[in-house]
A protein has these predicted regions:
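NAD(P)-binding Rossmann-fold cofactor-contacting core
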Residues: 168-195
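N-terminal ligand-binding/catalytic initiation module
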Residues: 1-127, 133-135, 145, 326-330, ...
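Residues in the short beta-alpha loop(s) of Rossmann-like NAD(P)-binding domains
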Residues: 155, 179-180, 243
């Protein structure tokens, strides 16, 4: 059993990017496999303290990597709410578990024996993997000399996005905007020292990205806000999740690459009818978009060289971290497990607790 603290002693942004880049080589060559994410939404009796739509979201992702002799399934069990902030719908996770905490675990299995070999808390892993995936997209799609970043969002995922970009590009200046009062300033003050980069808080999203080499969105918005008009020649747009860019970005960008073409499968309890009528909001993780994901190449194809990355300095490129895939958690769970075994970290649990003599 491995905690977030254990994972933090093994994971670096550098080894995370390396492990995931190798995974996308595997995926592009057909040498790894995953299924689309599954989300179950059901009513919750949790006291969330605000009068907004809320639900229990039970999410699973799985994937296998033969090269590592490993497979995993990631499970999150979240109480989520969907408030409106400054006219935009957001999704927030409520710390409803014991001690005001969250529930997210990766179960790592050996494909040699079929046995469960590790249970890993997923918080640290998740922060590293999202930033690393977007950085890999930037490595193949942004200009090599890109040094100025416009960042929209200053929450928990913003710092890892910048740390990952710094691994692949010579970042020297960042402008950050957040609609939450004081958040951008606090983020700039705390993160500038940690990264050794000049970070300035600005008054609007457009001011953040104007003249930037790379525009990064790292928000929990469930309403699109980034228009194609902000895509300047030579810019690379890196979106952390698919509800951030407006539809015209997909049409106007010269190159668009998705993390994956597979969408998650959402199953919503019919008990929400009354709530949906009251709030005028349909419970789901992401609102529907009129886009055919099959029209776009994925990151595995880009990394494996099956599709072209940036060809000219003036091209406007766009990477969308459309949704997570289980294989990314397999790759990093195996990295954490191997590193923790070498260091003697974690808590050993009896193997016989997780096997059975009766054939299932």
């Amino acid at each position: 059993m491995l905690s977030n603290d254990d994972a933090a002693k093994v994971l670096t942004m550098s080894n995370t990017i390396a492990a995931l880049e190798q995974l996308y080589q595997d995926l592009g060559a057909g040498a790894a496999v995953y299924r689309g994410r599954t989300d179950l939404f059901a009513p919750t009796v949790a006291e969330i303290g605000v009068d907004v739509p809320a639900a229990h979201q039970f999410k699973t992702l799985d994937g296998a990597i033969p090269r590592l002799h490993a497979a995993s399934i990631r499970v999150t069990s979240d109480v989520v709410a969907f408030p409106e902030v400054n006219g935009l719908r957001r999704r927030i996770k409520i710390p409803a578990a014991t001690g005001k905490s969250y529930v997210g675990l990766v179960f790592l299995f050996s494909s040699a024996t079929g046995e469960l070999i590790s249970i890993i808390q997923d918080g640290m892993l998740q922060r590293f993997t999202v930033g690393a995936i977007n950085a890999i997209g930037a490595k193949y799609l942004s200009r090599h000399e890109s040094s100025v970043v416009g960042l929209i969002g200053a929450g928990g995922q913003a710092g890892p996005q910048l740390a990952a970009l710094k691994e692949v590009r010579p970042i020297r200046q960042i402008r950050v905007y957040s609609p939450t009062p004081g958040e951008a300033e606090a983020f700039a003050n705390s993160t500038a020292t940690a990264l050794g980069i000049e970070i300035t808080a600005v008054a609007s999203a457009e001011m953040a990205v104007e003249g930037a080499d790379i525009a990064v969105t790292a928000t929990n918005s469930r309403a699109p806000f980034f228009p194609a008009a902000w895509l300047n020649p030579g810019m690379h747009l890196s979106c952390m999740q698919r509800d951030e860019p407006m539809d015209d970005c997909f049409k106007e960008a010269d190159i668009v690459v998705f993390h994956t073409r597979l969408k998650e499968h959402e199953y919503v309890s019919t008990d929400f009818a009354t709530m949906e009528k009251r709030f005028g909001f349909v419970i789901r993780d992401h609102p529907p978009r009129d886009l055919d994901w099959n029209d776009f190449p994925d990151l595995g194809e880009l990394v494996a060289g099956k599709v072209n990355g940036r060809q000219t300095p003036q091209q406007r490129t766009f990477f969308l971290n459309s949704t997570g895939v289980g294989a990314q958690f397999t790759a990093l769970a195996h990295l954490i497990y191997s590193g923790c075994r070498e260091r003697g970290l974690g808590h050993e649990l009896p193997a016989e607790w997780f096997v059975e003599s009766i054939q299932p």
